[in-house]
C-alpha cells in the first residue's frame, strides 16, 4: 500500500487480503536483534519537518503527520518534540510476570491470586492494611509538601500562557464544583442517563449517556469515550460547552462516557469492596472489560459498529483488547487515541515513581501499598476537604507528580478537573504501570517484526503533544509506519506545545483536535449501519 486508502476514498476493507499476507509473512516470529531499544529499521525521525503536513516516508503508505496550528504557537517559538521513550528492557521481568504464548504481542501480567477468607485471614488482612495506611499517609504528606515547594518555586520552568478569548476566560458561569456527570449535563441543558454494565467477570461499570433533549429526532451514531488513569467519565465534561462530550453531542452523536472498575462506587456481583479479589486487576483486565462495554452499547443503540475515543490509559486498554480479541475490531468503525499510553515518557522515571519502582516484589508492594485501593489517604482527604480546596490541592500535587504545566488551560477549569481526579483505583493497576510498563519501556514487545495488531484493527487516528512527558506518541508512530501494515491510519496529529491532557482540556482543543475526531468518525461510518432494534430499557426507538 503506497497510498492512504482514505486519501483515495477507498474502503479499508479492500485491503484485507493484502494485510492477511503481510500478517503471515515468514519473519513474523523473528525478534529485532536490537532489544536495547535502538532503531534497526531506521524509522526514527519520520515526520519531523515543521509544516502543515509532512512529506510521507517510503514506508509510511502515504500517511502524513499533521501539524495543526495551536494557541501555544501564537506566544512561543515552535520547538522540535521531546519524545524520547524510556529504554526498553525486555529482561526486567518480575517473578510474577512472564511472557506466555497466549499473548504473543504483549507481556502478560499475572495479577495477585487470593482465596477465600476466614475470620483469621480477614483479621490479618486488616492489620496489614492499617500498616499500609500509616505508610501511605506519611508518603502522601511528603509528596504534598514537595508539591507545594515546587508550586511556590519562582525559578521553575514555565511555558508562555496560550491566548484565550478574553470574554470566555473572564466569564462567570455559575457552576459549582461537582463530581457528578449528571450535574454538569443538566447545568448546560443536556440529559444524562446512567447505566450499569455487568462484565463477564462480574464487575459493574458505570456508563453515562449524554443527549440533547432540545434536538428533535434520534440520538445519532454511538461514540464511546474512555478516560485515563485516576480519572472518571467526568473528565470529558469539565470544559463547559467546549467539553469534548458536549461538543460531540452537538455534532449529532450519541455519546457514552464509560468508567473503569470501582469508579463511582461501582461494585461486583459477588466480591465486596473490602475483598482483595475485587481489586485484583490491571490494564489487561481493563481491556477485557472493553469487549463487554462495546457489546452493551451496541445492544442498547441497535448499531453494528461504534466509534471509540480513548485518552491515555483508555487507549492502552483498547490497544491491548484489539490485539487480544480479533473480533472486537469488527465492532469499531474507528479508534481515536488521544495521548496513547504505549510508550512511557520521562516523567515516570523521576521522583517519586523511581522510589516506588524500587519495591522489589509484589509481596513488598502489597505491604507498602496494600492489596486493595491505591493510596486510600487520598480518598480520606477528598472526603474531608471542600471540593474547591481539594481541586486546587490536587492540581498542585498532580502537577508535581507528572511534571505538567497549565499554559494551555483556562484557569477556572483547573479545580473542576482535579476535584474529580485522583479517584481511588487498584493498587495492582499501579503495580502494572510501574513494574511492567515503565520497567520494560513498552506495553507491547517492540522486538517483534510481525505486526502487533490483526487485520481486523479499525481505522486509527492518533493525537499526541510535543511536550507530553507522561507518555510519548512519536515512537508509536514510527512503529506503526514501519511494521503495522494492518493498521489503516486516518490522521496523525502532532500538537505543538500540547501536554498529556491538552487534547481534551486545551483552550483551543475544540478548534484543533475535536474536528479531527469528528472527521475520523464521519469518514469511517458504514453508510448501511442503521439502528434496527427497539431499546428495551427506555422503550424509544433510536
Predicted features along the sequence, with ranges:
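Catalytic active-site module of serine/aspartate enzymes centered on a nucleophile-bearing elbow/loop
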Residues: 486-542
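Conserved alpha/beta-hydrolase "acid-adjacent" motif
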Residues: 469-475
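Alpha/beta-hydrolase-fold enzymes
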Residues: 91-95, 99-158, 299-304, 313-446
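Short, surface-exposed "cap/lid" segments of acyl-processing enzymes
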Residues: 199-273
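Short beta-strand/loop motif that positions the catalytic acidic residue
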Residues: 456, 461-464, 468
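Conserved acidic catalytic loop of the alpha/beta-hydrolase fold
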Residues: 273-277, 287-306
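N-terminal cap/lid segment of alpha/beta-hydrolase-fold proteins
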Residues: 174, 179-215
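Intrinsically disordered, low-complexity regulatory segments
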Residues: 1-167, 356, 389, 393-397, ...
Amino acid at each position: 500500500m503506497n497510498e492512504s486508502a482514505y486519501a483515495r476514498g477507498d474502503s479499508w476493507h479492500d485491503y484485507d487480503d493484502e494485510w492477511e499476507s503481510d500478517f503471515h509473512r515468514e519473519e513474523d516470529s523473528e525478534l529485532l536483534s536490537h532489544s536495547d531499544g535502538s532503531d534497526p529499521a531506521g524509522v526514527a525521525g519520520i515526520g519531523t519537518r515543521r509544516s502543515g503536513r509532512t512529506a510521507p516516508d517510503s514506508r509510511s503508505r502515504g500517511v502524513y503527520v499533521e501539524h495543526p496550528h495551536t494557541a501555544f504557537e501564537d506566544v512561543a517559538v515552535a520547538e522540535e518534540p521531546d519524545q524520547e521513550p524510556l529504554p526498553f528492557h525486555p529482561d526486567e521481568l518480575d517473578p510474577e510476570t512472564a511472557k506466555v504464548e497466549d499473548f504473543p504481542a504483549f507481556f502478560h501480567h499475572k495479577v495477585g491470586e487470593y482465596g477465600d477468607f476466614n475470620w483469621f485471614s480477614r483479621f490479618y488482612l486488616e492489620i496489614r492494611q492499617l500498616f499500609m495506611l500509616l505508610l501511605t499517609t506519611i508518603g502522601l504528606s511528603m509528596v504534598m509538601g514537595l508539591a507545594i515547594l515546587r508550586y511556590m518555586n519562582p525559578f521553575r520552568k514555565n511555558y508562555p500562557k496560550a491566548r484565550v478569548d478574553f470574554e470566555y476566560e473572564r466569564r462567570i458561569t455559575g457552576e459549582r464544583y461537582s463530581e457528578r456527570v449528571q450535574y454538569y449535563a443538566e447545568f448546560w441543558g443536556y440529559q444524562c442517563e446512567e447505566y450499569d454494565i455487568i462484565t463477564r467477570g462480574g464487575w459493574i461499570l458505570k456508563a453515562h449517556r449524554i443527549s440533547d433533549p432540545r434536538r428533535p429526532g434520534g440520538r445519532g451514531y454511538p461514540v464511546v469515550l474512555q478516560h485515563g488513569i485516576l480519572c472518571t467519565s467526568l473528565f470529558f465534561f469539565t470544559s463547559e460547552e467546549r467539553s469534548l462530550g458536549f461538543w460531540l453531542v452537538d455534532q449529532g452523536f450519541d455519546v457514552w462516557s464509560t468508567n473503569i472498575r470501582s469508579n463511582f462506587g461501582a461494585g461486583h456481583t459477588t466480591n465486596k469492596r473490602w475483598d482483595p479479589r475485587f481489586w485484583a486487576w490491571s490494564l489487561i483486565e481493563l481491556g477485557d472489560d472493553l469487549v463487554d462495554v462495546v457489546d452493551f452499547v451496541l445492544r442498547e443503540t441497535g448499531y453494528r459498529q461504534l466509534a471509540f475515543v480513548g485518552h491515555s490509559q483508555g487507549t492502552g486498554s483498547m490497544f491491548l483488547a484489539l490485539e487480544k480479541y480479533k473480533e472486537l475490531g469488527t465492532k469499531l468503525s474507528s479508534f481515536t487515541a488521544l495521548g496513547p499510553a504505549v510508550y512511557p515518557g520521562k516523567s515516570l522515571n523521576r521522583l517519586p515513581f523511581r522510589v516506588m519502582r524500587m519495591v522489589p516484589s509484589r509481596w513488598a508492594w502489597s505491604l507498602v501499598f496494600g492489596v486493595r485501593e491505591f493510596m486510600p489517604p487520598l480518598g480520606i482527604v477528598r472526603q474531608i476537604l471542600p471540593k474547591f480546596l481539594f481541586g486546587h490541592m490536587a492540581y498542585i500535587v498532580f502537577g508535581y507528580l507528572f511534571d505538567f504545566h497549565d499554559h494551555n488551560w483556562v484557569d477556572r477549569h483547573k479545580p473542576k478537573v482535579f476535584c474529580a481526579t485522583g479517584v481511588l483505583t487498584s493498587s495492582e493497576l499501579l503495580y502494572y504501570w510501574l513494574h511492567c510498563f515503565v520497567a520494560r519501556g513498552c506495553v507491547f514487545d517492540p522486538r517483534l517484526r510481525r505486526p502487533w495488531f490483526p487485520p481486523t484493527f479499525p481505522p486509527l487516528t492518533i493525537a499526541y503533544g510535543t511536550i507530553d512527558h507522561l507518555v510519548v506518541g512519536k515512537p508509536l508512530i514510527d512503529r506503526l509506519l514501519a511494521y503495522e501494515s494492518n493498521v489503516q491510519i486516518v490522521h496523525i496529529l502532532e500538537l505543538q506545545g500540547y501536554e498529556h491532557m491538552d487534547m481534551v482540556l486545551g483552550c483551543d482543543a475544540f478548534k484543533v483536535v475535536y474536528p479531527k475526531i469528528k472527521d475520523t468518525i464521519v469518514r469511517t461510518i458504514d453508510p448501511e449501519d442503521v439502528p434496527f432494534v427497539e431499546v428495551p430499557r427506555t422503550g424509544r426507538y433510536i
